[in-house]
Structure formats: structure tokens, C-alpha cells
Regions:
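Short alpha-helical segments that sit at the start of domains
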Residues: 19-50
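Hydrophobic packing positions characteristic
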Residues: 1-19
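Long, charge-rich, low-complexity alpha-helical segments
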Residues: 41-148
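Radical SAM/AdoMet-radical enzyme domain recognition
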Residues: 178-199, 206-253
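Hydrophobic beta-strand residues in large extracellular and virion-surface proteins
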Residues: 18, 27, 52, 84, ...
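Residue-level recognition of the GNAT/N-acetyltransferase active site
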Residues: 57, 154, 206
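A secondary-structure boundary/capping signal
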Residues: 153, 199-201
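Canonical Radical SAM [4Fe-4S] cluster-binding loop centered on the CxxxCxxC motif
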Residues: 141-180
């Protein structure tokens, strides 16, 4: 066991998020997570484990955090150091055992604040925000709502591929307004979804695709990739770049 340095600030890796799911807590990664973290991660953890991680969402050194953990969990300093150390800069995913099976955690769960770079944030999560009554670590479907959403911006397309399942012939009489889409994006962000996928038709044929994508990027829930058949032009590339999108643009043939 590697003993952590008491004078350093350790934080919950900003590429990971905790979402209370009534009977457990969802631990998931952001889209666009770098290779030093576990990409496309989603597991359920015990609420008490989420509480422990919540103590590392503040700007304070371990020597300040440790007594707080000891008081909350009624454990000695030695016990808490042993527990916490396994989660600090772990190079590979780890797991703990419970009566409902193994609980998995991604790599580098807790990291030094100075190594978080521009992504560093202090969410200041409250321990009492993970209260639960009946533990359930096995049900796959989330209790609090979906983790992934998909918006079909338009069913219009620039091609007519025989293998495509999309209905591109039906004329949509009352499409969602851009304002309503922005409201839905805010709701999705408030719900703490992992990402919102964009599909078509051809999403770049929607008149306000740039506004929609930019808002998803701003809220950290942009799709991991966008598929298109649009002829790539300098203007299109510039527009995508201006949204701040850092994901993959897949050119389908």
C-alpha cells in the first residue's frame, strides 16, 4: 500500500461523475475522457463509497480531509488511510466485494489536484446527498432516469442509402423548435446524463445544429462522435470547430 502525502490536495477525478440513483449511486465518465482515465465507464457503487468520494470534492489537503472522514465513518486514521489509498491514482480499475456482488471503480479515481489541469473543479458535494433506504446494486436500469439520450434533429438526408433504416421520406409537420431543444438539453444536464447523441437524417441539415451542438459542449454532454455524409467543406469544418466540439466526426461512405 502506497501511503499518500498528507499535505497534498486529492480530488475526485474531474472526468468522473457521481449521480444519486435512489438505491445506489451511478459512477460514470465524461465523454471525451483522456486515455489516462477509463473511457465509457458506468458502474453502480454503494452510497457510502460515494460519500467517501464526496469528501474529495473540496479544495483542502488530505491532512484536513482525513479527520473528517474518521469522524463520519467512526474509523481510526490508520483504517481510513488504508481504505482511501487504494483509490488514489490507481493505475488500473479496482473492485470491492459486497453481498450483492463486486463493485467496480475506474482507474485514477482520486488524483492530485495539480494533475487535473484545466478540468479541475471542486463540486463540494454533500455527504447527505446520497441517502438511501433499500440498497440495489444489481438492477441494470436506472431508477432516476436515463443516462444516455438521443436527439434526432432531422430526418432529411443528402443521400438515399439502401441499407439505411431512417425514414427520410416522411415530412415532419411540427418539428421541435430550437428553443424547446435547448430546454431539453438543460433538463438533461440537470438530470446529470452522461451524453446526448445527435442523429438524423443528416444533422448538419438542421438550420440550428451549430447552436445545439455548442450548448451540448458547454454543458459537457456532447456526443462522443457525429456521423455525416455531408461533403466536407472548409466552412463546415470551421463551424464545427467554433462549437468547441472535441469529439469524432465520422465520415460515412
Amino acid at each position: 500500500m502506497k501511503i499518500p502525502e498528507m499535505n497534498k490536495v486529492y480530488v475526485l477525478n474531474p472526468h468522473y461523475h457521481l449521480r444519486h440513483d435512489i438505491h445506489r449511486v451511478a459512477l460514470f465518465s465524461s465523454t471525451g475522457t483522456d486515455t489516462d482515465c477509463s473511457r465509457n465507464w458506468h458502474t453502480f457503487i454503494h452510497p457510502l463509497q460515494a460519500v467517501m468520494l464526496s469528501f474529495f470534492t473540496y479544495d483542502r489537503p488530505l491532512q484536513t480531509t482525513l479527520p473528517l472522514l474518521c469522524d463520519f465513518f467512526c474509523r481510526s486514521k490508520e483504517e481510513m488511510i488504508k481504505w482511501v489509498s487504494d483509490f488514489i491514482d490507481n493505475p488500473t480499475p479496482i473492485y470491492t466485494s459486497s453481498q450483492q456482488g463486486e463493485i467496480y471503480f475506474p482507474k485514477r479515481i482520486l488524483i492530485e489536484a495539480e494533475k487535473a489541469g484545466k478540468a479541475l473543479r471542486f463540486d463540494r458535494l454533500q455527504a447527505n446527498s446520497f441517502v438511501w433506504k433499500k440498497l440495489d446494486l444489481t438492477t441494470r436500469r436506472l431508477y432516476s432516469g436515463p443516462l444516455l439520450l438521443t436527439f434526432m434533429l432531422t430526418n432529411q438526408c443528402v443521400t438515399h442509402c439502401k441499407y439505411c433504416y431512417a425514414d427520410t421520406s416522411t415530412q415532419i409537420k411540427s418539428p421541435l423548435t430550437t428553443q424547446r431543444m435547448m430546454e431539453l438539453i438543460k433538463e438533461a444536464s440537470d438530470l446529470q446524463v452522461q451524453q446526448v447523441n445527435l442523429i438524423g437524417g443528416e444533422i448538419f441539415l438542421h438550420k440550428d445544429w451549430k447552436i445545439i451542438l455548442k450548448e451540448l459542449v458547454k454543458r459537457g454532454i456532447a456526443p462522443e462522435f457525429i456521423s455525416t455524409k455531408m461533403p466536407v467543406t472548409q466552412k463546415l469544418l470551421q463551424d464545427v470547430q467554433e462549437t468547441g466540439y472535441q469529439g469524432i466526426v465520422q465520415i460515412s461512405l
